[in-house]
């Protein structure tokens, strides 16, 4: 049995995932859980970061096939899980991840129209249905989310998708909440301080329920 806990933050672009990852880490620290790391999917290992660069950088000379995108995401995810997350959990370290498995169901299935059974098969084959202890889904409308990121220095390949694409992704997330356990929905359309407060309340409630 894993000694640490695996926490995941999900949501579309502009939902505040990176900020909330740091917030949850601070909440755990204040609660006395001080051995915590934050990672990002894809990324957080040397090889996974190289794959991440391929995924978010648009190549003017070649279109990335949707199936290629999916397999690259899984290649990076396997590196992250096998080399960082599982070893950390086995040592009693808590891990907070910016994205995980639900992102593939939302982005590649709803966004890219890849059959869901393909993603489920990849997850089963390579990660043995390795699941988080709890997932925070930051729900934001594409209008608000995309407006938040428009002032960034550079919009990456994923962020360049249409509002229609992100509506499909968001709707998939909302459907997943209804069918999968352990997902907490947070209204991320609000100002970040209110989002942080809601996440803190939910995290403390979960810790209390789990007697942690």
Swiss-Prot record:
Summarize where ATP binds, as residue positions. 11-18
State the Gene Ontology terms under molecular function: ATP binding; dTMP kinase activity
The alphabetized list of GO BP terms reads: dTDP biosynthetic process; dTTP biosynthetic process; dUDP biosynthetic process
Q: Which domain of life is it from?
A: Bacteria
Job description of the protein = Phosphorylation of dTMP to form dTDP in both de novo and salvage pathways of dTTP synthesis.
Keyword match Transferase = yes
Matching PANTHER family: THYMIDYLATE KINASE, UMP-CMP KINASE 2, MITOCHONDRIAL
Which catalytic reaction applies to this protein? dTMP + ATP = dTDP + ADP
Sorted alphabetically, which PROSITE patterns does this protein's record hold? THYMIDYLATE_KINASE
Query: What is stated as this protein's family in its record?
Result: Belongs to the thymidylate kinase family.
Q: What is this protein called?
A: Thymidylate kinase
- Family matches, as InterPro entries: P-loop_NTPase, Thymidylate_kin-like_dom, Thymidylate_kin_CS, Thymidylate_kinase
Per the UniProt entry, the Enzyme Commission number(s) are 2.7.4.9
* UniProt keywords, alphabetically: ATP-binding, Kinase, Nucleotide biosynthesis, Nucleotide-binding, Transferase
Name which cysteines form disulfide bonds. Answer: none
A single GO cellular-component term on record = cytosol
Matches recorded under SUPFAM superfamilies: P-loop containing nucleoside triphosphate hydrolases
Which Pfam families does the annotation name?
Thymidylate_kin
